[in-house]
Amino acid sequence: MTPVEFLASNPLAFVLCALVLGLLVGSFLNVVIHRLPIMMQRDWQSQAREFLELPAEPAGAAFNLFLPHSRCPHCDHQIRAWENIPLISWLALRGKCSACKASISKRYPLVELACGLLSGYVAWHFGFSWQAGAMLLLTWGLLAMSMIDVDHQLLPDSLVLPLLWLGLIINSFGLFASLEDALWGAVVGYLALWSVYWLFKLVTGKEGMGYGDFKLLAMLGAWGGWQVLPLTILLSSVVGAVLGTVMLRMQKAESGTPIPFGPYLAIAGWVALLWGDQITASYLQFARL
């Protein structure tokens, strides 16, 4: 029996493998979340210097998603392999650097745990299938985008656009929606928030959201078809309004403070892709339509 046949015939083993893989990917996503915005800023600065015809900055050491090796931000201690095992290392080190004993942010293990649990659930929901593999990629991308948006109010094109094209490609095989529905989903998803953006700007003179949000909703439409868009917009708006109000009441945000909308879109789109039909059917039954 090949490993593929074993996983296909043992759902629990597939779920456990997906969970472990998710933990490992979550560790890498922590690197992406931290380094990708820095890489983008350096690229923008380089382009600005070139546009202004300024001398290029001297080339420094390589800085990308793989180099240099991760180090403690407090003492510059290079993280060893055994200190980089998802969850286990953080627990073994009791959340502190092995060299200087400075605290390690709890967000690192939480991202790893979230990625692992979400990956395990996707494997359980879809079973051993192409849908599960595709949904894992989308889940990891949405998690990275959401955290970057929380930190920087930025949704990188380098993450959003490849996933948009991937959604169209996989739906050319009808994995989640027909190609026609996926194309309309991408177009309508972009135009829906673009229209809201300009209407809000005309009325208030302010920008209510960023262009990255348009692209993110277009990407979700490319994955689930235009049918997932109404539920995605509704859920993200409700959750965003509720959490925004809670944050204002708790004085964690001031009135007028920009609140990233990307995480709400990501969560709502993920929910709509997994349970959209069930949620819609339950609502129609409740409303007796």
Swiss-Prot record:
This is Prepilin leader peptidase/N-methyltransferase. Gene3D superfamilies: 1.20.120.1220. PANTHER family: PREPILIN LEADER PEPTIDASE_N-METHYLTRANSFERASE-RELATED, TYPE 4 PREPILIN-LIKE PROTEINS LEADER PEPTIDE-PROCESSING ENZYME. Keywords: Cell inner membrane, Cell membrane, Hydrolase, Membrane, Metal-binding, Methyltransferase, Multifunctional enzyme, Protease, S-adenosyl-L-methionine, Transferase, Transmembrane, Transmembrane helix, Zinc. InterPro entries: Peptidase_A24A_bac (IPR014032), Prepilin_IV_endopep_pep (IPR000045), Prepilin_pept_A24_N (IPR010627), Prepilin_peptidase/N-MTase (IPR050882). Zinc is required for the N-terminal methylation of the mature pilin, but not for signal peptide cleavage. Plays an essential role in type IV pili and type II pseudopili formation by proteolytically removing the leader sequence from substrate proteins and subsequently monomethylating the alpha-amino group of the newly exposed N-terminal phenylalanine. It is found in: Cell inner membrane. It holds the Pfam family A24_N_bact. Belongs to the peptidase A24 family. The gene is pilD. Signal peptide: none annotated. Its EC number is 3.4.23.43, 2.1.1.-. GO terms for biological process: methylation; signal peptide processing. GO terms for molecular function: aspartic-type endopeptidase activity; metal ion binding; methyltransferase activity. It is a multi-pass membrane protein. It catalyses: Typically cleaves a -Gly-|-Phe- bond to release an N-terminal, basic peptide of 5-8 residues from type IV prepilin, and then N-methylates the new N-terminal amino group, the methyl donor being S-adenosyl-L-methionine.
